[in-house]
Amino acid sequence: MDFNTVSSFQDILMRMSKMQLRSSSEGLNGMVTQFESLKIYRDSLGEAVMRMGDLHYLQNRNGKWREQLGQKFEEIRWLIEEVRHKLKITENSFEQITFMQALQLLLEVEQEMRTFSFQLI
């Protein structure tokens, strides 16, 4: 394929991908926002693991950090189930690819949160 054909094909795929995301359920934006929040929380756990004495720091800063951690795990499990459900009911291949990638990211974030939290406990 020549460069123009490849470029045009990529452009079409991008436009179709954007159209499919807009046509997905309204809850998708909320799911993305929640996912971003969970990624930030995961990053803060990772930073806490790297600093010395952070278990005490976390306990002093937030006496209910274990409860907060439990809530974050509930959130990510809910998001995983939502994405799995949408994946099952979606017939459009572009949406299926998008939801498969989202599911993979969610599972990675959940695993990293578990790893960091076990190191803190």
Swiss-Prot record:
InterPro entries: Flu_NS2
UniProt xrefs under SUPFAM superfamilies: Nonstructural protein ns2, Nep, M1-binding domain
GO cellular component: host cell nucleus; virion component
Superkingdom, taxonomy of origin: Viruses
Miscellaneous remark of the record: Average number present in a viral particle is estimated to be 130-200 molecules.
Assembly information from the UniProt record: Interacts with protein M1. May interact with host nucleoporin RAB/HRB and exportin XPO1/CRM1.
Record family assignment: Belongs to the influenza viruses NEP family.
Protein name: Nuclear export protein
Source organism of the structure: Influenza A virus (strain A/Swine/Wisconsin/1/1961 H1N1)
